[in-house]
């Protein structure tokens, strides 16, 4: 399974993702420059965290116009796996690959800390190797992680089982206190209707090695590899 990790001007988590996929997961992985029209026959695409184009205008607002994102849209439309992490999630919403938007955190401050997220569905390639209801510890690092959408979109996400992760307590309770940024209904990650595109604010690549003190995030990448092996 070959992964492609996008690089935009201002990305800063691209090398982290590349390291985890190549050195920890032992998968073929390549960098894809933002001006590229070619995804180089990759089986899965990672839209990494950072500050693409300096977050000018809005987070992800300029990145959506880059040539590589046009290629990613076509790739996703054909069922290709795409995971957007933090700024990558913001880019996916701006690009129309996922509904809703990410606003400034409720407390108007940048937040960088470990959080707990509960697995809400295993009916997706990204979580097929996990258990519904289990809790993962994964760090966040964002200023605009407050997920919002209109009532109709929220109802659709629930009906179609597309809420993939929610912020929770260590024992899996969905509480106001467990929500770090004010995200509607504690949403930490969602997928598209085809279930092949995931956007999440927490950083699984920062929780993928013992040296980092957390390894739960690596299981998301393992699930992707396992799902592709079954195709």
UniProtKB/Swiss-Prot annotation:
Main location: cytoplasm
Reactions listed under catalytic activity: N(2)-formyl-N(1)-(5-phospho-beta-D-ribosyl)glycinamide + L-glutamine + ATP + H2O = 2-formamido-N(1)-(5-O-phospho-beta-D-ribosyl)acetamidine + L-glutamate + ADP + phosphate + H(+); L-glutamine + H2O = L-glutamate + NH4(+)
EC number from the UniProt entry: 6.3.5.3, 3.5.1.2
A single GO molecular function term of this UniProt record: phosphoribosylformylglycinamidine synthase activity
Pathway the protein takes part in: Purine metabolism; IMP biosynthesis via de novo pathway; 5-amino-1-(5-phospho-D-ribosyl)imidazole from N(2)-formyl-N(1)-(5-phospho-D-ribosyl)glycinamide: step 1/2
Cross-referenced InterPro entries: Class_I_gatase-like, PRibForGlyAmidine_synth_PurQ
Keyword list, A-Z: ATP-binding, Cytoplasm, Glutamine amidotransferase, Hydrolase, Ligase, Nucleotide-binding, Purine biosynthesis
Glutamine amidotransferase type-1 domain boundaries: 3-231
GO biological process, one term: 'de novo' IMP biosynthetic process
Gene3D superfamilies on file: 3.40.50.880
Record's subcellular location: Cytoplasm
Active-site residue list: 86, 203, 205
SMART domains named in the record: GATase_5 (SM01211)
Transmembrane segments: none
Subunit and interaction comment: Part of the FGAM synthase complex composed of 1 PurL, 1 PurQ and 2 PurS subunits.
NCBIfam families listed in its UniProt record: FGAM_synth_I, PRK03619.1
Name of this chain's protein: Phosphoribosylformylglycinamidine synthase subunit PurQ
């Amino acid at each position: 399974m070959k992964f492609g990790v996008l690089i935009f001007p201002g990305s800063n988590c691209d090398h982290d993702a590349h390291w985890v996929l190549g050195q920890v997961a032992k998968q073929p992985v390549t960098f894809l420059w933002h001006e590229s029209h070619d995804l180089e026959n990759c089986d899965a695409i990672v839209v990494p965290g950072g500050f693409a184009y300096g977050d000018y205008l809005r987070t992800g607002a300029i990145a959506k116009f880059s040539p590589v994102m046009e290629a990613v849209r076509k790739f996703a439309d054909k069922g290709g796996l795409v995971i957007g992490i933090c700024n990558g999630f913001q880019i996916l919403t701006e690009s129309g690959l996922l509904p809703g938007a990410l606003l400034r955190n409720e407390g108007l401050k940048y937040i960088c800390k470990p959080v707990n997220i509960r697995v809400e569905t295993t009916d997706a390639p990204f979580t097929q190797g996990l258990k519904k209801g289990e809790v993962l510890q994964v760090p966040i690092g964002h200023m605009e992680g407050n997920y919002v959408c209109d009532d109709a979109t929220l109802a659709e996400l629930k009906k179609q089982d597309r809420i993939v992760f929610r912020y929770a307590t260590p024992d899996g309770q969905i509480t106001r206190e467990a929500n770090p940024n004010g995200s509607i209904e504690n949403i930490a990650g969602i997928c598209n209707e085809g279930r092949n595109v995931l956007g999440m604010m927490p950083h699984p690549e920062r929780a993928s090695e013992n040296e980092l003190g957390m390894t739960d995030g690596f299981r998301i990448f393992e699930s992707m590899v396992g799902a592709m092996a079954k195709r």
